[in-house]
Amino acid sequence: MRRPGAAERFGMKILQINTVYGEGSTGGIVRDLHDLCADRGIACVSAYRGPAKGRTAPEDTVAVSSVWDGRIHGQWSRFTMFKGTGSLLKTARFLRWVDGYAPDVIHLHNLHGSYINLPLLFEYIKKRGIPVVWTLHDCWAFTAICPHFAMIGCEKWKSGCRDCPQKKRFSSAPVDLSGPVWRAKKAWFTGVPQLTVVTPSRWLGRLAGESFLGAYPRETIPNGVDLDIFTGTESDFRARYALEGKKLVLGVAFAWTDAKGLDVFQALARRLPEDYRIVLVGTDDRVDRTLPPRILSIHKTADRRQLAEIY
């Protein structure tokens, strides 16, 4: 595990915590914020569940968990519904490191990747009184087990989850423990002395305000865009895929499901005129098997310049 070093010569020290680093949507956001801090002379360390087997952690990052610990924690979470209650030893070790680093601000992101013990983490934060910014990328922080509920119109999270309609999707537990899980999360996540909730949209901010996180101050900060990459870009994308003269409808997601609107694009493909084509980025072989011919599928990519060419 990385020890405090030369970067800490600067004044403010920030610690970010997220499931992943440098991959996927939230991992890219964490990496970009990490790099922005470095450019501005602010010390920043990003903690995440750890690199995949055979890979090494990037500089100025900390692996909270390990591959095997994550698997055990994940299975425990699936069968008990209590995500974030494993990884006791790994989290205790990580928090000893945090004491040595002594961050001025902790920036939380996604905590639901079966890599960190949430009761230990929040007990530590409350005792130390460290200011916290918590950026919510979905709704998991204020529900029992689900990251999204709009599809099914569930509002039980406002007063207390119970009889979870998405239990089979997110848990293998033999009984529904969504009520105790929701109450536990409320106890863990409330009562932090200095915590600000940040959301990338007003919609998510409104939902957070209606939840048990509503007592905290909230800010809406849209996700940033790297204008050095996402700018006017020469591209042969249309010619490469025989799309010249077509009107394009573009959809981009890290993992396509009906919750991300996959079913809407499938229905749209059947209704649009012939001079339209739909392009979905972030697909995989499983999604490909469900797509009609008029949808162009482009598999997941971590190459932001390729994305800029498509845009």
Regions found by a protein language model. Give the residues of each.
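Membrane-proximal helix-turn-helix segments that form the acceptor-binding/catalytic region
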Residues: 126-127, 140, 156-197, 206, ...
